[in-house]
Swiss-Prot record:
InterPro entries: ATP-synt_VA_C (IPR055190), ATPase_a/bsu_AS (IPR020003), ATPase_F1/V1/A1_a/bsu_N (IPR004100), ATPase_F1/V1/A1_a/bsu_nucl-bd (IPR000194), ATPase_V1-cplx_bsu (IPR005723), P-loop_NTPase (IPR027417), V-ATPase_su_B/beta (IPR022879). Its main location: membrane. Coiled coil: none annotated. This is V-type proton ATPase subunit B. Belongs to the ATPase alpha/beta chains family.
Length: 512
């Protein structure tokens, strides 16, 4: 039986390529133009969306890009390292046939990388345990576990009143000139689990890791983070990704995805509890706007693309816990609100996706209070599942509610005092003013290197609430009030007596 030429060709092709997984790649010299961070390619065959492209420049240097759009035989590629120096006639382009992947390993802990995932700490390259797609894999909603157990940050205003659950995503809303970098560094230094519960098999400190990604930061901020982590020893459990302000803007689009892919490997394959901090998401959104403008897309609010909500969700929704895995990813993105405007599209859309917010206040900062966290507009929607008996303390929820109520009343009393004067205030209003002053001075304010446990913060909260008579503490259950209010009052009296008479020694009651 004779075979046709076509059949013979197919048999020869199969014999030659059998056992080979690598397909031949085609190089193109068909760069049609350059527009901002984008390169337009002509006459290319079968380009794929999100495919990685290698561009070889005339000087021999190689840059990576990603296919953003395909129109027939044309492809639009965003170049991560920028398009300066790309010669339209002499640049060669190679399609790899793969999505962008990052080599991951436990050895990434203690290392510093640039915004594209290359080591910049003079250490060796990562010996990869696996190569993972930076876009991640969608998690089956049915496989997700509700976030529980509290992560302690050592900051009273966060731990007591806006507790963060393991697996939660909660942003920090800041503004230009406010100390969000210092707060982020403090959280990295001090973060850890409060106490392991029955499903946390391994709660020791080595099992808690941090992935930190900075986008568009200046050299001074970059040096601050590197030096701070190295000096206090937290670098050993931290992986840093640093995209500087003078790095290509387009690189900021992949930096948070590299960080989250690393976090997913540490959480779901090595079963660690990972805290992921992303700063500054406003720089990321600006990079998104730049690409959108270069593609001449119809702009949305303030010039940002209409798909920014969807794009942000592909980052924020990669936090959480998964059934059958002990690890978790808790996300704390930080964003600066342009002109302190909370209605700006970036904080507005972020607030829809995430589970609360921590609000950094300029007025508190101007009065010298650090950290300047305004607890009234702050919120943690999953706090109820992270606190209480067995996780923190049984009085945690009631104390938090009472602090919120009394702080709001104190703010109203301060506004009234500005109008009618202190003489016209009632006794309760004067107590509220005293509470307001001590709450901001002693509770919210703390040192940058002061690490308060949740139990110390709750004890401090009780000492402030004792300014009021028991009858005015109406947000705390009578049972808890009866158990803790009187005993704390006696302890305070003992401490006052000891201050008056240093030689006097007596037994002190231990706080619950």
């Amino acid at each position: 039986m004779s075979l046709s030429d076509k059949e013979l060709f197919e048999l020869n092709k199969k014999a030659v390529t059998e056992g080979f997984k690598i397909k031949p790649r085609i190089n193109y010299n068909t760069v049609g133009g350059v527009n901002g961070p984008l390169v337009i390619l002509d006459n290319v065959k079968f380009p794929r969306y999100n495919e990685i492209v290698n561009l070889t420049l005339p000087d021999g240097s190689v840059r990576q890009g990603q296919v953003l759009e395909v129109r027939g035989t044309k492809a639009i590629v965003q170049v991560f390292e920028g398009t300066s120096g790309i010669d339209v006639k002499k640049t060669r382009v190679e399609f790899t046939g793969e999505n962008l992947k990052i080599p991951v390993s436990e050895d990434m802990l203690g290392r510093i990388f640039d915004g594209s995932g290359r080591p910049i700490d003079k250490g060796p390259k990562i010996f990869a345990e696996d190569y993972l797609d930076i876009n991640g894999s969608p998690i089956n909603p049915y496989a997700r576990i509700y976030p529980e157990e509290m992560i302690s940050t050592g900051v009273s205003a966060i731990d007591t009143m806006n507790s963060i659950a393991r697996g939660q995503k909660i942003p920090i809303f800041s503004a230009s000139g406010l100390p969000h970098n210092e707060i982020a560094a403090q959280i990295c230094r001090q973060a850890g689990l409060v106490r392991p519960t029955k499903d946390v098999h391994d709660g020791h400190e080595e099992n808690f890791s941090i992935v930190f990604a900075a986008m568009g930061v200046n050299l001074e901020t970059s040096r601050f983070f590197k030096q701070d982590f190295e000096e206090n020893g937290s670098l050993e459990r931290t992986t840093l990704f640093l995209n500087l302000a003078n790095d290509p803007t387009i690189e900021r689009i992949i930096t948070p995805r590299l960080a989250l892919t690393t976090a997913e490997f540490l959480a779901y394959q090595t079963e660690r509890h990972v805290l992921t901090i992303l700063t500054d998401m406003s720089s990321y959104a600006d990079a998104l706007r730049e690409v959108s403008a270069a593609r001449e897309e119809v702009p949305g609010r303030r010039g940002y693309p209409g798909y920014m909500y969807t794009d942000l969700s592909t980052i924020y929704e990669r936090a959480g816990r998964v059934e059958g895995r002990n690890g978790s990813i808790t996300q704390v993105p930080i964003l600066t609100m342009p002109n302190d405007d909370i209605t700006h599209p970036i904080p507005d859309l972020t607030g829809y996706i995430t589970e609360g917010q921590i609000f950094i206040d300029r007025q508190l900062h101007n009065r010298g209070i650090y950290p300047p966290i305004n607890v009234l507009p702050s919120l943690s929607r999953l706090m109820k599942s992270a606190i209480g008996e067995g996780m923190t303390r049984k009085d945690h929820g009631d104390v938090s509610n009472q602090l919120y109520a009394k702080y709001a009343i104190g703010k109203d009393a301060a506004a009234m005092k500005a109008v009618v004067g202190e003489e016209a205030l009632s006794t309760e209003d004067k107590l509220s003013l005293e509470f307001l002053e001590k709450f901001e001075k002693n509770f919210i304010s703390q040192g940058a290197y002061e690490n308060r446990s949740i139990f110390e913060s709750l004890d401090l909260a009780w000492s402030l609430l004792r300014i009021y008579p028991k009858e005015l503490l109406n947000r705390i259950s009578p049972k808890i009030l009866e158990e803790l209010y009187g005993r704390d009052r006696e302890q305070d009296d003992d401490e006052d007596e000891d201050e008056e008479d240093p030689d006097k020694s007596g037994d002190k009651l231990i706080d619950a």
